[in-house]
């Protein structure tokens, strides 16, 4: 019974790490990759 709980814990940990790395990678891709050309800087567009 203890092995099953440990296995579930590791599976959940691996899933959480995978999701975290996936979201981080997607954010970096969006910020610095090809989609970044479509991003607009509101501070540069705003005239004082």
UniProtKB/Swiss-Prot annotation:
It is a single-pass membrane protein. Pfam families: PsbN. Its main location: membrane. It is found in: Cellular thylakoid membrane. Keywords: Membrane, Thylakoid, Transmembrane, Transmembrane helix. InterPro entries: PSII_PsbN. One of its GO terms (cellular component) is plasma membrane-derived thylakoid membrane. The keyword Plastid does not apply. One of its GO terms (biological process) is photosynthesis. The chain crosses the membrane at residues 12-34. The keyword Chaperone does not apply. May play a role in photosystem I and II biogenesis. Belongs to the PsbN family. PANTHER family: PROTEIN PSBN. This is Protein PsbN. It comes from Prochlorococcus marinus (strain MIT 9313).
């Amino acid at each position: 019974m203890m092995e099953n709980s440990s296995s579930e814990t590791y599976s959940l940990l691996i899933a959480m790490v995978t999701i975290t790395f996936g979201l981080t990678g997607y954010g970096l891709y969006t910020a610095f990759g090809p989609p970044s050309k479509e991003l607009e800087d509101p501070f540069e567009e705003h005239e004082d």
